[in-house]
Amino acid sequence: MPRFLHVGCGPKRKNQTVRAFAASEWEEVTLDIDGSVKPDIVDKLPELSRVESGSFDAVYSAHNIEHLYPHEVPLALKAMLRVLKADGFAILTCPDLQVLGERLAAGDIDTPLYTSGRGPVSPIDMLYGFRPAMQQGNLYLAHHTGFTMKSLGSACIQAGFANFFGFRRPRRHDLWGLATKTRRTEDEMRELGKIYLMPL
């Protein structure tokens, strides 16, 4: 049975990832820095030091890399690459700075863009981190870096991934990317995207 590493899972589990991973064919192993959410592995980015090399078919990381400092991003991506099997791939999601930039250019940083399960999210929350959570002491949710589609793909390739495929969701204000450990054709990358970049 293929396994995926759910990095920075928080309270979410496989039925809140992507359609393919929610199926019974995939086994989920959860990882989080916060032991209170009861992950399978208590560990953190950028190191993933408690995860064996070449031990996973896929890595799923939703809205984690923006919480790293810029110099930690290459280390985190290399760690994801390290834990993947030879034909493995990583799925990454994060806020879309291009959409955010358009709102900032209009001078509006306070009007909510959308409402999350934790409450309204404004441009300033996307830029610096969700303020209500940080006010409650969860400083892990502070944002220290950000990406456009181009910069996310470049970061993955520079970290050693062979290919990158992704898309923007302007109405959802986020980016979705898939990076493979071994080289694939453009058609193969598109097919992988159709299968695995299907949010629930």
Q: Each predicted region: which residue ranges?
A:
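Conserved long hydrophobic alpha-helices within structured protein cores
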Residues: 1-10, 116-124
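Conserved SAM-binding loop
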Residues: 3-102, 179-181
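S-adenosyl-L-methionine-dependent methyltransferase catalytic module, highlighting the catalytic core
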Residues: 72-79, 83-85, 89-200
